C-alpha cells in the first residue's frame, strides 16, 4: 500500500530518524556499560538497540514508495557520561516517544487511514513501553552500583518487543512465535 498523506510520511521520516539515532546511541552506551563493569546493562542496551533498529526498519519499509531526498528532523539525547545518566537519557527518550511522539503519530495515521503506518507506529509505541520499564529497572540497580541479573534478553524481530529471561510463546504485540525471537 502506498502512502497518500504527506503528514503521515513526515511523521514516519521523523520516527525513522529518531529510532536510527537511538539504535546507534544505545550501542555506544552498551560499550561504555561493558567497559565500566556492567556487562548485563550492556547486553540490555544492545538488545534494545536491535529493537530500535526493528522500528526504524519498519518505518523505512512503510516509506518504500517515497523516493528522493528528505531532511529528517528528529530529537535525540546526546552525551556519554556515566551509567546512571546514560540510563536516564535512555528512559527519558522512551518516555518522550510513549507520552508525546507516538500517540500523535498513531492517531494521525489512523485518521488518515494509513494502515501500514498505523501498524508500524503501534508496534513501536507498544514496545517502547517495555523498553522504558527495563531501563528504569536497570537504572535503579546502577544507582546502587549493581548490574542487572538478566542472563538472556529476547527481542521480537517484527515489532521490537523486548523481554528478559524467556521469550513468550507468542509476542503479545504482533503474535510472532517464540522461536523467531532474537536472543541477546
Give each language-model segment a name.
Residues 1-184:
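Non-heme di-metal
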Amino acid at each position: 500500500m502506498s502512502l497518500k498523506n504527506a503528514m503521515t510520511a513526515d511523521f514516519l521520516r521523523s520516527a525513522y530518524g529518531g529510532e536510527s539515532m537511538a539504535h546507534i546511541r544505545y550501542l555506544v552506551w552498551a560499550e561504555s556499560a561493558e567497559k565500566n563493569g556492567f556487562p548485563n546493562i550492556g547486553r540490555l542496551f544492545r538488545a534494545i538497540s536491535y529493537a530500535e533498529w526493528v522500528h526504524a526498519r519498519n518505518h523505512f519499509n512503510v516509506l518504500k514508495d517515497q523516493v528522493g531526498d528528505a531532511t529528517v528532523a528528529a530529537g535525540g539525547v546526546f552525551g556519554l557520561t556515566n551509567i546512571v545518566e546514560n540510563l536516564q537519557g535512555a528512559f527519558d527518550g522512551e518516555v518522550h516517544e510513549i507520552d508525546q511522539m507516538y500517540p500523535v503519530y498513531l492517531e494521525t495515521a489512523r485518521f488518515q487511514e494509513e494502515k501500514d503506518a498505523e501498524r508500524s507506529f503501534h508496534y513501536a509505541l507498544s514496545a517502547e513501553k517495555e523498553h522504558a520499564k527495563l531501563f528504569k529497572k536497570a537504572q535503579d540497580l546502577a544507582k546502587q552500583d549493581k548490574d542487572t541479573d538478566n542472563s538472556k534478553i529476547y527481542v521480537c524481530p517484527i515489532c521490537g518487543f523486548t523481554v528478559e529471561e524467556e521469550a513468550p510463546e507468542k509476542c503479545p504485540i504482533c503474535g510472532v512465535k517464540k522461536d523467531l525471537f532474537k536472543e541477546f
